[in-house]
Every structure is written in structure tokens, then in C-alpha cells.
Amino acid sequence: MINFFRKKRKIVLDTSVFINPDIRNFFGENPEKAIEEFIKIAKRAKNLEFYIPSTVFKELMYFVDEKKIPKDFYFLIRIKSPDKHRSVCPAIFFYELVEEMRQRINKGLRVAENAVRNVNQKDADEIIKDLRKKYREALREGIIDSKEDVDLIFLSMELQATLITGDQGLIKWADKLGIEWIVPEKFKDFLLSAIG
């Protein structure tokens, strides 16, 4: 029973914690400040372990100057990819993913057809801009759409960890797979609760 209380809770972090302004602003005004504030709090949360897949870490580095990241970052956050050769995923995951992708492709096709119908009514640049926006909404919102997303899902499953992300597609699929997640807007409060 005592081991239960000593066991560290594992947390898998998405870049949205530090990059997405709606979430990041709970920690800092820019990604570097958000990382600094996160590190200050995370250092004191002794009962939590933090992980980030290597693909997500590389994505994060596109947005921050690595020289400005506190050295403690590399001590507190473990960069770990999921074991892609041993990960097991329920068949229903693939079944539902394929079905959803097919529906989205059909929706994307309808968006493209409507753009073609509007050719005489708008100039080409406006049509392309509108097409890109609607096509992106039809195909990408609410779905796992990158290898980074897959790594976050599989690492969370492998570690039996809590996923922290602002990506609605990841939240949706984490929920389907029984992965615990925390509303990112409440993540700082969660960290502070882990301290006290």
C-alpha cells in the first residue's frame, strides 16, 4: 500500500503546452518563458515524471532557441520515443481511424468541388485561400494527423501516463483508447496541486 503513494505519476507533454498561446500564457508570454516557469514548478513536483517523445522535442525546437532553455529541462523532462516495435494497439483504433479518414476525404472533396463552382464569382487567390482554410478544417481538425501525434498516443499508452495536450484530435483519440488526459488550461493548477 505504501508503494502506491510513492509511485510517481507519469506525464507526457505535447508542444502545445509551451507553444499554443491559449495554453502557454498560463506559464509565460513566449515559449522560452513558458518553459522556464514550467521548470520552476516541475522541480518541486517530486511525485511526477515528465516525458516528451523525440519527434515532439524536435518540433518544440523549431519554436524555441535551444540556448535559452534552462539546463534543468533535460534533467526534468525525459526525451523518450515509444517502442514502436512492441507497441500494441486495438484493432478498433485502426478501424475507426480509417472510417474517419474516409469521411474526411469525402468532405474535403466536397470543399474542393464548391471552390471550383465559385471560380467565376471570386478571384483565384481568394478561392485558393478559402479552399485551403476549409480543406484544412475538413481533413485535419479533430484527428491524429502527424507522426508526432502517434508518438504521443503510443508513449502515453506504453507508460500508462497522463497526456497533456491542447490538440483536440489527440484528446479525442486518447479518450477512445482510455488514455488519461488533463485539460491543458488546468495543467498549471494540476502541477501546483502536486506540490502542495
UniProtKB/Swiss-Prot annotation:
Signal peptide: none
GO terms assigned for molecular function: ribonuclease P activity
EC number of this enzyme: 3.1.26.5
Coiled-coil stretches: none
InterPro entries found in the cross-reference section: PIN-like_dom_sf, RNA_free_RNase_P
Any one GO BP annotation for this protein: tRNA 5'-leader removal
Superkingdom per UniProt: Bacteria
SUPFAM superfamilies, A to Z: PIN domain-like
Reaction catalyzed: Endonucleolytic cleavage of RNA, removing 5'-extranucleotides from tRNA precursor
Record key words, sorted: Endonuclease, Hydrolase, Nuclease, tRNA processing
Role description: RNA-free RNase P that catalyzes the removal of the 5'-leader sequence from pre-tRNA to produce the mature 5'-terminus.
Family: Belongs to the HARP family.
Protein name stated in the entry: RNA-free ribonuclease P
